[in-house]
A protein has these predicted regions:
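Single-stranded nucleic acid-binding proteins centered on OB/S1-type folds
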Residues: 1-425
Length: 425
């Protein structure tokens, strides 16, 4: 491309002492290109961030991802260009003209478009063959490892929650986790780094439709995973305000920080994981029917805080008790949430497992059966200690179990932080 430009310039007697204005597609980008002008659509965009130079002077940087018919590329907007008037109003799919940009390689060797003092961005209403966001949206059943800068569509499958962590540089971070399923019904884990609950509605139904704009596909410990960052745009069906929930308390566990972890069920036999950070349920006991106004409801994950309220109601026979929601072992299916009653066939075994990151974690497992079948019950970390109290021949009731596919296609049950084990004999 560059060699051809030199030939054309020579034919027309143009001096090459000045940079040559170049127009090209994103797939043809190369480090060193200058005076680059091209037409693309916006995929997503990060907030502007402030950094310091070596001399201590501040500068701003904003990152944008753009796409055309064939490829995607990262765009860096420096200093004043990071806060161009109206840039916050750019939306996914908007057609823009990038003017007089230059290209450098990023840390991974990929060409990155840079917009500095001599460059600009303009919104255009030209007719374009570049597809719209809707046209490039994929169902998550179509995903493959290694794909990047995707727009994907799926439905909430289970819990949506946020987490805090410490990154490799020792700095605190946050992430939003969820699980989505596509047209084939298969769930895929989603991790959105740099996101938290403030970026999504307070009320999200258990089967809500979700579109994520700007994600990458990686292979994790349990298959494909969808990864995003603070530039990823989240579109979720939901309401700003949570709605009241009426449920029967099935079991109450306590987290290490004292938070009450309550498993509840409503009249449709939908199980809820209720995290009480405000001690609002201190007056309640297992078996009670309660009405709560949560601060957030993400799928079946319910949060109670100081802005929530809880009240006890008269018993409602239409809301099932624990005995009526227990599942027989032969009816357990992968990714479901269950409560079971069984007899211990094999005492729990405890061992240390080393993860890919080198961390050693505790795993306990025991073998149980009911009158329909047998299954392994396992617990990691703190949940492993719950199993250690079980003994051979005991009849036990376990709540808050999650079913996963194990070795050789067999299904295994895993304790969660909402699990409780009660001995029946």
């Amino acid at each position: 491309m560059l060699f051809r430009s030199f030939l054309i310039a020579s034919d027309f007697g143009i001096s090459l002492s000045d940079p040559l204005k170049v127009e090209m597609g994103l797939k043809d980008l190369y480090a060193g290109a200058k005076e680059l002008s091209l037409e693309t659509r916006v995929l997503n965009m990060s907030p502007a961030k402030q950094f310091s130079r070596k001399d201590g002077s501040p500068f701003y940087l904003r990152t944008m991802t753009v796409y055309d018919k064939n490829s995607t590329a990262s765009v860096k907007l420096w200093d004043d260009k990071a806060n161009l008037p109206g840039i916050e109003n750019l939306k996914p799919g908007d057609l823009i003209k990038i003017i007089k940009a230059y290209v450098k390689s990023d840390l991974n060797g990929f060409p990155t478009i840079n917009i500095g003092s001599g460059s600009n961005i303009e919104v255009t209403d030209n007719k374009s063959e570049i597809p719209t966001i809707d046209k490039i949206t994929k169902d998550i059943s179509e995903l493959q490892e290694g794909q990047k800068d995707l727009v994907i569509l799926g439905n909430i499958d289970g819990v949506v929650n946020s987490m805090e962590y410490t990154n490799s540089r020792g700095l605190p971070g946050k992430a939003l986790r969820m699980r989505l399923k596509g047209k084939d019904g298969q769930p895929i884990r989603v991790i959105l780094w740099g996101k938290d609950g403030s970026t999504i509605p307070n009320m999200i139904s258990q089967d809500a439709k979700v579109r994520l704009i700007g994600v990458n596909i990686k292979n994790g410990n349990q298959g494909l995973e969808i990864h995003g960052n603070d530039s990823t745009i989240i579109e979720i069906e939901g309401d700003k305000e949570a709605k009241p929930i009426i449920a029967r308390i099935i079991s109450i566990a306590t987290a290490g920080n004292g938070t009450s972890l309550i498993l509840g069920v409503d009249k449709k036999k939908i199980l809820y994981n209720i995290s009480d950070y405000s001690n609002s349920t201190s007056i309640c006991k297992e078996g009670d029917v309660i009405e709560c106004m949560p601060s957030k409801v993400y799928g079946n994950s319910v949060t109670l805080d100081n802005d929530s309220f809880v009240r006890k109601l008269e018993n409602d026979e239409s809301i099932p008790s624990l005995a009526k929601i227990r599942t027989k072992i032969n009816e357990v299916k992968v990714d479901g949430n269950y409560c079971i009653e069984s007899i211990v066939l094999k005492i729990p075994e405890r061992r240390e497992i080393q993860t890919k990151s080198g961390e050693s974690v505790l795993l306990s497992e025991m073998f149980v059966e009911d009158d329909t079948g047998q299954i392994w019950v396992k617990g990691w970390r703190n949940q492993a200690r719950l199993l250690e109290k079980c003994e051979l021949g005991e009849i036990i009731s376990i709540t808050g179990l999650n079913a996963k596919a194990g070795l050789e296609g067999r299904i295994e049950l895993f304790l969660t932080s909402f699990s409780k084990i009660t001995k029946k004999n």
